[in-house]
């Protein structure tokens, strides 16, 4: 198969594996892996892709691959990753794989300089290239730009963001302190906003949009940082393998003894807010020695430091202090920040116990007195006031008058703990807001022309336990994915369609329904949550039940017990829900959703903190107090500030800003879950590529044009440098002249209605045209003028040459016309005078016989004069007849009559002479004359036979044409009957198609859900749920798997088995099921037969019905296989033709989609039709114009001929005759892969006028081209299938 060419087939852990096709199934291909010879497996045909010929080759832009598909995309990234080339393009989108180690010199100052002003594609892929492209686009298009850095947690978004900022400030900064401040702001923001998670050691727990502002000279003048959704819950609690924000550990590890004493710090294990997670520091050998022993936790002393090339708590503390100094923070302000951080730690160490009195409430534990003292000291609070505010809540009643009565309500231990944590989260979040504001103050700007914004926000998150923070993060990623779909897929395709470029449509999954589920007015999850917060007694259970009730049948929402992970099935329906996101299904536990959605403190704590003695603390809360001063607290009730609504508003403002800018995308990829270098997990990387839309982009860029410019925009850019004669040009014509002057290849660009578009990888040419440097523009105008002058002279030369050619052609045609006239006149004259000429020839022959008569007479002894007289009379009669024929227009019958009379006279004379000769001589002479007459008679008979044969052939051709017309009439009559039935069927087919597309979307979502569950299972050491707990759709598809004898449940599976199981589940798609259902109605079920078995049965079976069924299935598989080859052909190559396009186009389209949507009422049963016409032999000939010549000048087209011999409904022999290459001969059996796979009815040949030819015409060409020898060799090698042709040849050979 495929001449041994390798293909990519699905693999559960590597994504794809290379193999060879060894068999073609009904809806699948049998693959033999290259590394496991002798072993085979089945793969769905639409999941198999052709592989590059050189498996070790890599390309910088995936659009340069010979085959553009997800398998070659993954393999190219893998090959480049193995060579430490972590960056790859898909057109103008950058794919960045996290290497998890430092690659030397890749981000050096020399590297920065090498990318300055360079077009995309002229240097190896790099994040610097994207940054420089954004800058050049901003400068040329006079439009602000955005760079969206996206990817999963741990994929390298934060680092790539820092490299973009560093590149812009180093390359296009003013050389002042402001450039350093923008770069140095990152360590400070990371210290307060980043933390270690399970999947990332330096995970950003907030989103930021960093704007670098430029003046009219395109120099950096300032910056601004917007931040979104700090994860406040992390301040109070973390997972076992996670840490709190870096600042806490860096302060403990790196603070001087003086600061440490002032802040009363110790090792991390002594603080509640740190010791429930990981208490180890990040350090290397040198910094480990610099950290004092009393600052190390027992866990650290036991297991040692954690290693990361980018993190070092002791060294990072020093770097953070340096950054603070560079951005303008003095020592006092620096100490203020540290003081609040330490105050939060001490606040967390305050514990409560139940009070002994009957009034209820709680008291501080004795051991917490020290922590209370430290906390009050650091935050500028009174100890007693802090104690009272944490253990009681002030309520204001209105029953006692206008001013009301103040009542202190004691809090229970749990309520006091919640109040303490709420205060800690509020203080830290206000501190973070202050840090961001302070960062923004360090690079102010008065005026700004444009900006480049870099978005770094938490990637899609899916843990074993997901809460409100993950819900908001994933909601944000849904919105960003929709923006990506709109900008790259939707808007691009709409533009292509509007401009008339004819690019094939690319389908993608629209996630609008998921976004509506979350943010829709009144019924969206965020609004339901806000409504719950406003209730007198809100609860998470009531909120969850309301979500399920209002979205009972929503496709994107389901209950936890339908999760693929067993751990989620223990969650009750009112404790969580599952949302099917674009990247997969995530189960959210709604505990604390209501609490986390409220950003307000109760009145006691808010009053306490706002009245702090410390000026810095008061300043932290002043802005918040001013913003919320209109919010009045009702008696006994907390005020409500919605976190979700605030985030939604911020997110919508961000997206509005992104939509108003030009966008560049950096897709960060996480190579493995262990966060180790040089380890490539193909399956989970493939999932990231699919979820990020890279596969859809690759499909679009096969025919896409990522760069474009308006004709008028280009024209106006060059107009002021044009001379008058150029200024009069039409903008479109000017652009055409400009491209010609630059020598651009016509395949690299395409003209739309109002814009010119450039192919992927042609960014250098595009930038050359768009470069707005005055000298450069003037130079290009000169080149355009030069090209126009040259082209006009060439036109003059061409016109002169054309006139000469035209003169010669007229002369040639005149001579040809004379020659045609001469020939026709000769033919007419010949047809008119041929009977007379033939008569003269015959009579002349008779006259020649007189010499023999004279010889006979000369030997006679008696009666010579009389005989001479008779001979003389006969000669006179002959001469008279010849003269008469020459002078008069005699018919053939008249000539024949008189000729016969002369013959009779000559015969009578001859018999008289014979009497006078001796018996022997007379007998001998008579015999000779009779022989000559017999020859003449035979010749006349042969002429008559030839004439009858020609008339018979003309009659047969007329009968064939009449038969074709009769078949055409019958077909039209049948079509009229079918139209009536088809009208009823079309509505049903439309419904079926809609249901099928919906089912396909569900299957695709199920696949993503299962892949995501598999990745969670691998990272969390969990197992996918067993069959007894699977959802209904999955149970139905897996009931054929073995069941354990002990407990009746399925055995636990490895990840590879789980992935294989999912692949088999997906193979039960609607198209496959429809095919199998159709096969079930037939007498023979051939769906499990191998391709070779079908072929052998066709060659050997005598069962006519089985033979017909096998032939039908055999050719159906050929159609599917050839459709797969056509879909996955090489880029920029024509589809190989097994028959002329007019034949294959007639019935090829349905197989490209692999969907059996043909009208069942419009088909005659193929088997019945084959039995009826089984022994019919029909021959056809039609023109064969090659694809390369399709759009050439008609006179220069190279037209060949395509011959076909159909034995019944299927092709038996095929010939291709081309003027510039040897004939191509094909016979059934030996050359099935190269021959036309359609049956006679599907080709439409019987309905093509003049296509059918006589058997003799086919056989003559077949024999002349060596077909007999070719077929004989195929028969001898047992490769030819038994057909009428093979039987006839074998009988001739015998």
Swiss-Prot record:
- What residue stretches are annotated with the IQ domain? 814-834
Q: What are the recorded Gene Ontology BP terms?
A: actin filament organization; actin filament-based movement; DNA damage response, signal transduction by p53 class mediator; endocytosis; inner ear auditory receptor cell differentiation; inner ear morphogenesis; intracellular protein transport; protein localization
**Tagged with keyword Glycoprotein:** no
Residue intervals of the Myosin motor domain? 57-771
InterPro entries xrefs? Kinesin_motor_dom_sf, MYO6_lever, Myosin-VI_CBD, Myosin_head_motor_dom-like, Myosin_N, Myosin_S1_N, MYSc_Myo6, P-loop_NTPase
Superkingdom of source: Eukaryota
What CDD domains does the database record attribute to this sequence? Answer: CBD_MYO6-like, MYO6_MIU_linker, MYSc_Myo6, MyUb_Myo6
Gene Ontology molecular function: any one: ADP binding
Q: Which Gene3D superfamilies match?
A: 1.10.10.820, 1.20.58.530, 3.30.70.1590, 6.10.220.10, Kinesin motor domain (3.40.850.10), Myosin S1 fragment, N-terminal (2.30.30.360), Myosin VI head, motor domain, U50 subdomain (1.20.120.720)
**Span list, region Three-helix bundle:** 835-916
- The segments labelled Required for binding calmodulin in the record are 782-810
Region annotation (Interaction with TAX1BP1 and CALCOCO2/NDP52) maps to 1060-1285
Instruction: Provide the residue span(s) of the region labelled Disordered.
Output: 934-955
Region (SAH) residue ranges read 917-984
What is the first-listed, main subcellular location in coarse terms? Golgi
* Domain called Myosin N-terminal SH3-like: residue spans: 2-53
- Annotated compartments: Golgi apparatus, trans-Golgi network membrane; Golgi apparatus; Nucleus; Cytoplasm, Perinuclear region
Disease implication from the record: Deafness, autosomal dominant, 22: A form of non-syndromic sensorineural hearing loss. Sensorineural deafness results from damage to the neural receptors of the inner ear, the nerve pathways to the brain, or the area of the brain that receives sound information. DFNA22 is progressive and postlingual, with onset during childhood. By the age of approximately 50 years, affected individuals invariably have profound sensorineural deafness.
Known partners and oligomeric status: Homodimer; dimerization seems to implicate the unfolding of the three-helix bundle region creating an additional calmodulin binding site, and cargo binding. Able to function as a monomer under specific conditions in vitro. Forms a complex with CFTR and DAB2 in the apical membrane of epithelial cells. Component of the DISP/DOCK7-induced septin displacement complex, at least composed of DOCK7, LRCH3 and MYO6.
Q: What is this protein called?
A: Unconventional myosin-VI
Organism for this UniProt entry: Homo sapiens (Human)
Q: What taxonomic classification does the UniProt entry list for its organism?
A: Eukaryota, Metazoa, Chordata, Craniata, Vertebrata
Q: Which gene encodes it?
A: MYO6
